[in-house]
């Protein structure tokens, strides 16, 4: 699995724009924003971006109305174009 790894990067993803949507949609929108950021910066399609459970738990930690303003993510892109992302330590 390490042989076909192409690119590994740690990103700080800003989620300030999520505060502009209705409160009950914010955590859902944050997941969409994280996926969109990774699609843009890792140059892949959205169906090939896999978010780890830890990212989802961090975004939903304070409920759907109060996601964090930013999140640090470690993203790994493989040779087949798939991107796996997990919460950076």
Swiss-Prot record:
- What is a biological process (GO) this protein takes part in? cytoplasmic translation
Write down what this protein is called. Answer: Large ribosomal subunit protein eL31
Classification via HAMAP family:
Ribosomal_eL31
UniProtKB keywords: Ribonucleoprotein, Ribosomal protein
Similarity comment: family membership: Belongs to the eukaryotic ribosomal protein eL31 family.
Say which species the protein is native to: Methanosarcina acetivorans (strain ATCC 35395 / DSM 2834 / JCM 12185 / C2A)
Family matches, as PANTHER family: 60S RIBOSOMAL PROTEIN L31
Tell me one Pfam family matched here.
Answer: Ribosomal_L31e
The highest taxon in the source lineage is: Archaea
Q: Which SUPFAM superfamilies does this UniProt record tie to the protein?
A: Ribosomal protein L31e
Alphabetical list of PROSITE patterns matching this protein: RIBOSOMAL_L31E (PS01144)
Q: Which InterPro entries match?
A: Ribosomal_eL31, Ribosomal_eL31_CS, Ribosomal_eL31_dom_sf
Question: Upper taxonomic classification of the species?
Answer: Archaea, Methanobacteriati, Methanobacteriota, Stenosarchaea group, Methanomicrobia
